[in-house]
Amino acid sequence: MTIAPDGRSLVGEVVRLDPLQDSDYDELYAALASEQVYAGGFNGGVAPASAEQMRAEWAPAVAKRFAYTVRTVADGAVVGTSSLGDVDLTNERIHLGWTGYTPSVWGTAVNPATKLLLMQHAFEDCGFGRLKIQTGLKNTRSQAAIAKLGATREGVLRRHMRQNDGTWRDTVVFSILADEWPEVRKRLEERIAG
């Protein structure tokens, strides 16, 4: 039986994922308000001008998914966000996405540790059979990171989404199936261990 995520905190050795709260936006803005973050297409490619604008733009979408604030366990610093959404219990499908990190943690164990916790929750706690991850076609850094997780590239959805700057995004879709999860989990654990 597949159940929806329950919105609880997910805690690992490297990161802690807490349900995104209204009080997190100041720290999220400080972590993510960098042109580097948005240049690859995060949040439609346009950085908000303030924490208040971020809150106003994000709140409607965040209310429709299980959004998390990513903190490092070592010092509790807010380093990003990631979410589970597009929940389809009948067809056992879920989408892991809406992920962005401060550039100082790019290439560290933060992303694999975050993905491990979210995938573990989706596959093991909730019983999903398919997890989708997608990114913009121009975001080659994210495509490489998703492929490194062990996800299968399924294809490109052309002219898929209008971005905040008015341009259209082509979207690259990847997936991981439940029977692939044990191998993906092993690879993630090895990456986190160094």
Predicted segments, located by residue:
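GNAT-family acyltransferases
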Residues: 1-110, 121-125, 167-194
